[in-house]
Each structure stands twice: as structure tokens, then as C-alpha cells.
Amino acid sequence: MALRGGHAAAAAGVSSGSEDDDEEAGFSRSYFLAKEKEPSSGKKRARAAGKLSDLNLVDEQVLRASLAEIPPKHEREVEALTRSYKEQYRNWLFELRCGFGLLMYGFGSKKMLLEDFASTTLSDFTVIVVNGYLPSINLKQVIVTIAEIFWEQTKLKRKRQTATRSQLQPFASQSIDDIISFLNNQTSDNGDDNVCLLIHNIDGPALRDAESQQYLAQVSCCPQVHVVASVDHVNAPLLWDKKMVHTQFKWSWYHVPTFAPYKVEGVFYPLILASGGHAQTMKTALVVLQSLTPNAQSVFRVLAEYQLAHEKEEGMHFSSLYTKCRERFLVSSQVTLNSHLTEFKDHDLVKIRKHSDGQDCLHIPLVSDALEKLLQELT
């Protein structure tokens, strides 16, 4: 019996070994078959050379309408979260009165939350709302508005009922530094004289430059001005240095994820998978041009200026462009100009049209307004 068992074990071992060999051989065959079916390196390069502009993108309005039809989820949980934030309103008000600025961050739109806080809790403040998510903001006008509010309050205190609106006009003609100096001199023990600057997205595209942030920081230092703001960009803290954070804004950070959709804020941002029209095309063109050499940018500017000056023409002849670029010492030969034009055409910055005389002419596929704005941004 033992002998039979030994033979059985040996047979099992042989069988197991042969199965392993077969499996390994099968794996090897599968590997080489897969390699044979892989596309060649040339095909890989061709596929990698595909551009986003080659895709058939859905119209932006259709895409936004579809997004609006998506039903909200976890409504009860979101409502409970919002209620927990509302319970902190008194603490927020206390910190605001103590001279701190409130900075709200976290996933989701905080627009409704902040406006609810302002309408229910800041009744003793004059609230000025700044929509930082807008593409452009007149920051000086915001500061002028604050100054006019204090001027009105001063006028009421002194009972100067005869004062006319024209007395407020000098603020608009003054520099921002002068207006901030005026604000710094406004002091009062009356809580009703406080102004709250409510900034939705202080990290918005129109407020991201250093100058705007410096002015906002200086305004936040004014005795009667308080700041409540929200941020959404992951790199928002990089907008401020240590002095701005701790001695000017004096931020008190609050993590308040609302998970609310960015319905209002998102209107001003183009959707990646949508054909966003002239505004998005202009932004894309600007990004591409900024990555090119100054000489290439100057060549593009020559073509753009010609197109703006001759809107009714079909385009600019290559010979005319070459002559103008030679006059400005931008190119030394047609080969150099051709290399620039090839780069423009690869990025869809320039199209070639057939002129009525049969010659090829160059055309930038942007409407005049977008082209003018592009040239302004490029300087």
C-alpha cells in the first residue's frame, strides 16, 4: 500500500509539474501574441499627436442644461451640515467684532452660506458684497463705495443735510492710497458705523494679482472695516505673505465644506468638454502664445494688427507678412517665417485661406473683439 502511495505521489508530482510547464508556455505564447498585436511606434506617435481640438465637443449650453438636470444627492446630510454651520454664526460674529477676518474654505459653493450669515447676523453692519469669481472687477470702485458710506455717516453725524452728491465725487478722482488713508482715519464707538466687506472667492481670477491683494489687505486694516471671504483654489494661501495673514487680514480659518454646486460661480468658467466659443478660444490662444518665443509673438502681432486694420479683407498674403516682419527685424529669411507659421498652424492660431486672386492668405480665426483683447493680454 505504501508503495502504491509513493507511486501515486510521484505521478501526482509529474502531473503537477507538466501542468505548470503548460501554464508557463501558454503565458509566453499570450505575451508574444499580445506584442504582435500592439501598434507600431509610428502609430503610437500618430495617436499621441492627437489634439483636444480634434474632438467633437458638445455645445456648452446643451452641456450646462444637462448638468442642471442632475438630481441632488444626500440632501438630508447636506442640510444637517448647513445647520451645524449656522450654529456657529454667533462665534463668527464675535471673532469679527474682535478684529479678525473670517476665511471660509472647503468643497462646495459657500455663496449662499455667507449671504445667509450676512443677512441674519450682520444686521448692525453695512455689508458690501464683492463677487470675486467674476472675470473682471473694478477694485477701486469697491474701495470708493466704502469711502462714500463713511462719508455719508460723517455727514449725518454733523447734520449736513445741505451736502450734495457732488461732494462725494472727489473719491473717484483720488488715488486708492489716498482713499485708504481716509478710511484709516474713520474711528467710531458706534457699532452701526461698521462696514463688512463680503468677498466671494477672494482668490478669483480678477483678484489674484499681488496689487489687488495688497489693497484688500490694507483696507482690512481700517478700524471700521471687517472682511469675510471665501476661497476655493487649492493654492489660495500662496496669495499672502506672513504679514498679510497675521497682521493685516488676521484670518480666522474655517473649514466649511457645503457640497453645494457652483451654479453661479461656474457660469463664468468654460467647461473643458464643451465648445466654449470666442472667450475660451481666446484664452487657449493666449496660453499657447505665451509659451512661444518673443519673436514668434511679435510675428503673430503683425498679422493680428493687419487683420484688425483690414477686417473686410480675406487675409494677409505671405509676401506682405514677410515684408513687414523684415522691416521690423523679426525674421531674416522666409525659412524663419515659415517655421513660426508652422507652429501657429499646428496650434490652430492661424488658418490658410484662398484669396480671390487665387493666392493663399493667412487668417487668424478670431472675431475682432476677441483678437483685440488677446493683443492686450499679450503685452
UniProtKB/Swiss-Prot annotation:
GO terms for biological process: DNA replication. GO terms for molecular function: DNA replication origin binding. Its main location: nucleus. Residues 8-17 have a biased composition (Low complexity). It is found in: Nucleus. GO terms for cellular component: nuclear origin of replication recognition complex. The keyword Cell inner membrane does not apply. Pfam families: RecA-like_ORC2 (PF04084), WHD_ORC2 (PF24882). The keyword Ubl conjugation does not apply. Residues 1-25 are annotated as: Disordered. Keywords: DNA replication, Nucleus. PANTHER family: ORIGIN RECOGNITION COMPLEX SUBUNIT 2. Essential protein. Component of the origin recognition complex (ORC) that binds origins of replication. DNA-binding is ATP-dependent, however specific DNA sequences that define origins of replication have not been identified so far. ORC is required to assemble the pre-replication complex necessary to initiate DNA replication. Belongs to the ORC2 family. Component of the origin recognition complex (ORC) composed of at least ORC1, ORC2, ORC3, ORC4, ORC5 and ORC6. ORC is regulated in a cell-cycle and development dependent manner. It is sequentially assembled at the exit from anaphase of mitosis and disassembled as cells enter S phase. This is Origin of replication complex subunit 2. It comes from Oryza sativa subsp. japonica (Rice).
